[in-house]
Amino acid sequence: MGRQAEFWSESKNNSKIDGQPKAKARFASKRPNGTINTHPQERMRAANQQEEE
């Protein structure tokens, strides 16, 4: 194995998952009124309902 491959392999195997998550609430997608889509299954069910005339 070459020197470059050894370095890459070491850095990949030594990666840590400890610490704070990188995703932050301030970057979450929100609607213009400030709400977020917390119940997508309900929305999908409502979209598939047949409208009765």
From Swiss-Prot:
Induction: Expressed only in the forespore compartment of sporulating cells. It comes from the Bacteria. One of its GO terms (cellular component) is endospore-forming forespore. InterPro entries: SASP_SspK. One of its GO terms (biological process) is asexual sporulation. Residues 1-53 are annotated as: Disordered. It is found in: Spore core. The keyword Heme does not apply. It holds the Pfam family SspK. Its main location: other. Keywords: Sporulation. Belongs to the SspK family. This is Small, acid-soluble spore protein K. It comes from Bacillus cytotoxicus (strain DSM 22905 / CIP 110041 / 391-98 / NVH 391-98).
